[in-house]
UniProtKB/Swiss-Prot annotation:
Similarity comment: family membership: Belongs to the class-II aminoacyl-tRNA synthetase family.
Protein name: Glycine--tRNA ligase
Source taxon at top rank: Bacteria
Gene name linked to the record: glyQS
Region annotated Disordered, chain positions: 113-134
Chief site of localization: cytoplasm
Binding residues for ATP: 197-199, 207-212, 284-285, 328-331
Length: 463
């Protein structure tokens, strides 16, 4: 039975830490707030999400190509993009604890709890730490970009920024891609990479962090077709999450109000997931924005390079509009884990029913595709099982485990989402066959050892 998401989130966070999906960064030194490292299972899970996104958005289409641009970009790029001027958040400080918060986040949390804005503004908002009636400083603007200096001296000339989004690296390479890849609108450029934002209030596990990964694509279109393409990408990206196992009831679309649109956007629609956070359970997975011609126009103006496109078929020249589906990789990571978590019952070695925790991940996302398990640690069984695991490892990420009772080893694999367990038993020594157990229904099937690779291949398509 699937428990309510609100009660699942803490369980999944604990599972992620305990089983090696995610570790607090620098933990032996006390850690860094909202910074996380991805362990053996987490790094495989992340790579699988990226692989599915890349196949769906880039290599699975003839109208999209890939790019990997630099994390550090010149200051002029961010001046042109508007980030230096407008990439600010209103910051207030509690006069009780002297902690700083985004004013808009405090107000949004109040609205989510009470169903209306605070009548007297910040004066009605209690201190999040102490619960006392809040006493706040006046809001101040806080730039969220992280600075760095290149060269031996920290001067204005060497000032650069760590990118707060991957998009600008795509825009400044627009002309390069058009020329070398021989592309013309409608076409897109996709990119996966790290971005950095000096968030005032990071938190909610890996949902909001200062260092994060984005899966972004900029789709360049003739201006009159922008609205149609925008809706196409909203629908396409929403369906991607559903096809990879997210329950549609836990997804929704959120239309940004006109007064809260980013400086470049004509319309933005967020794909949100019901994470189960306190206050407001919904959180953004991905934003799909119509950025109009803002980006190419501003970079043309500031760089002096013509970034318009000449259409020979219509003998016309125009600045393409941009439709941007921008997904958070680590937010997707978190949503897929939460949505896959199920608790049911399974018999133990004595036949008694016990609680079983399962990650019912789509096999394409599962960090381990199959586990090879000798029935027991035995001089004849373990080597045979190891040889089979080595053969299968040529194709997939495979675990070998011969420690403990077979039932416990099944549970360990269920808990990390492994779709198949292959058991080598004493009969295997005679008939050269193994038992394949399915994760979700625990059904078992006996097949020849030399047929295991073909058996899994037929059931792990797209992995």
């Amino acid at each position: 039975m699937h428990r309510l998401v609100a009660s699942v989130i803490d369980t999944v966070v604990n599972l992620a830490k305990r089983r090696g999906f995610v570790y607090p960064s620098g933990e032996i030194y006390g850690g860094t707030r909202s910074a996380w490292d991805y362990g053996p299972l987490g790094v495989e899970f992340k790579e699988n999400i990226k692989r599915q996104w890349w196949r769906s958005v880039v290599t699975g289409r003839e109208d999209v190509v890939g790019l990997d641009s630099s994390i550090i970009l010149p200051r002029q790029v961010w001046v042109a993009s508007g980030h230096v001027e407008v990439f600010h958040d209103p910051l207030v400080e509690s006069l009780i604890t002297h902690k700083r918060y985004r004013a808009d986040h405090l107000i949004e949390a109040y609205e989510a709890k009470h169903g209306h804005p605070p009548p007297n503004g910040l004066a009605d908002i209690r201190d999040p730490d102490t619960g006392e009636p809040g006493r706040w400083t006046e809001p101040r603007e806080f730039n969220m970009m992280l600075k760095t200096y290149l060269g031996p001296i920290e001067t204005e000339e060497g000032l650069h920024y760590l990118r707060p989004e991957t998009a600008q690296g795509i825009f400044v390479n627009f002309a390069n891609v058009v020329t070398t890849a021989r592309k013309k609108p409608p076409f897109g450029i996709g990119q996966i990479g790290k971005s950095f934002r000096n968030e005032i209030t990071p938190g909610n596990f890996i949902f909001r962090t200062r260092e994060f990964e984005q899966m972004e694509m900029e789709f360049f279109v003739e201006p009159s077709t922008a609205k149609e393409w925008h809706q196409y990408w909203i629908d396409t990206r929403l369906q991607w999450y559903v096809e990879l196992g997210i329950d549609p009831q836990n997804l929704r679309l959120f239309e940004h109000p006109a007064d809260k649109l980013s400086h470049y956007s004509d319309r933005t629609v967020d794909i949100e997931y019901k994470f189960g956070f306190a206050g407001n359970p919904w959180g953004e997975l991905e934003g799909v924005a119509n950025r109009t011609d803002f980006d190419l126009s501003t970079h043309s103006k500031h760089s002096g390079v013509d970034l318009s496109f000449y259409d020979q078929a219509t003998d016309s020249r125009y600045i393409p509009y941009v439709i941007e589906p921008a997904a958070g990789l680590t937010r997707s990571f978190m949503a897929f884990l939460i949505d896959a978590y199920v608790e049911d019952e399974a018999p133990n070695a004595k036949g008694k029913m016990e609680k079983r925790a399962v990650l019912r991940l789509d096999p394409r996302l599962a960090p381990v595709k199959a586990a090879v398990l000798p029935l027991s640690r035995h001089a004849d069984l373990s080597p045979k099982a190891r040889d089979l695991a080595a053969e299968l490892r040529r194709f997939w990420n495979i675990e070998f485990d011969d420690a403990g009772a077979i039932g416990r080893r099944y549970r360990r694999q269920d808990e990390i989402g492994t779709p198949f367990c292959v058991t080598v038993d004493f009969d295997s020594l005679e008939d050269n066959a193994v038992t394949v157990r399915r994760r979700d229904d625990m059904s078992q099937e006996r097949i020849g050892m030399d047929a295991v690779a073909d058996y899994l291949s037929a059931r792990l398509k797209g992995c």
